[in-house]
């Protein structure tokens, strides 16, 4: 009986994670953040598995069959996205991460090219308080920016090394940018990841507009 209950709970968590991935994809598609099948979304099921979108599917019309159940300690499953290693590395590094959402939105794609690589510092925006741990617009928010790289295993190692370093004198963002590519954002739950994604993308829009009117 105990075994049956455990299996039922595992199945319930898996179904919930799949539903959250589908909802995240639909929300991003409505905002036009994932054009032409771009982007990928994942939600942690348990300590060893995540639900993650497969390659080449429209994120606005995901079906349960478009979601892979990927073990964290196993090779990538067939039909996996080339960017799956970037998700898996973060889940392995930080057990507190419950969901990771990646979009190719205009603001993050353009602003990341302007920055190039290094760090984007955001300061003075009230919306920064939507990020977990930030309580004032006076706190600086540091978003790491990396050069885009088609070798995502190598890129995952670079990201991990940079995150270990932290952000001196600023609050580390729950996300990072790939130049000319887009944003990865995460949170302790799918709801928090969605809030962080929306907040960061909106902050990038603010920053782009502000830079147009300042030398």
Where are these regions (language model features)?
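Glycine-rich flexible loops
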Residues: 2-215
């Amino acid at each position: 009986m105990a075994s049956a209950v455990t299996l039922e709970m595992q199945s319930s968590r898996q179904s919930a994670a799949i539903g959250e991935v589908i909802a995240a994809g639909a929300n991003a598609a409505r905002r036009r953040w994932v054009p032409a099948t771009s982007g990928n979304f994942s939600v942690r099921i348990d300590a060893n598995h995540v639900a993650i979108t497969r390659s080449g599917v429209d994120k606005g019309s995901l079906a349960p069959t478009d979601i892979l159940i990927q073990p964290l300690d196993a090779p990538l499953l067939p039909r996996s996205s080339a960017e799956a290693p970037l998700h898996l590395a973060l889940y392995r590094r930080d057990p507190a991460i419950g969901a990771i959402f990646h979009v190719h939105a205009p603001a993050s794609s353009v602003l990341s090219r302007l920055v190039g690589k290094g760090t984007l510092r955001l300061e003075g925006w009230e919306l920064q308080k939507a990020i977990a741990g930030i309580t004032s617009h006076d706190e600086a928010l540091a978003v790491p920016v990396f050069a885009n790289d088609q070798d995502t295993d190598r890129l995952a190692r670079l990201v991990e090394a940079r995150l270990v370093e932290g952000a001196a004198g600023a609050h580390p963002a729950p996300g990072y940018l790939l130049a000319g590519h887009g944003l990865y954002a995460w949170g302790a739950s799918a709801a928090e990841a969605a809030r962080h994604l929306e907040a960061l993308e909106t902050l990038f829009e603010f920053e782009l507009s502000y830079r147009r009117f300042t030398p």
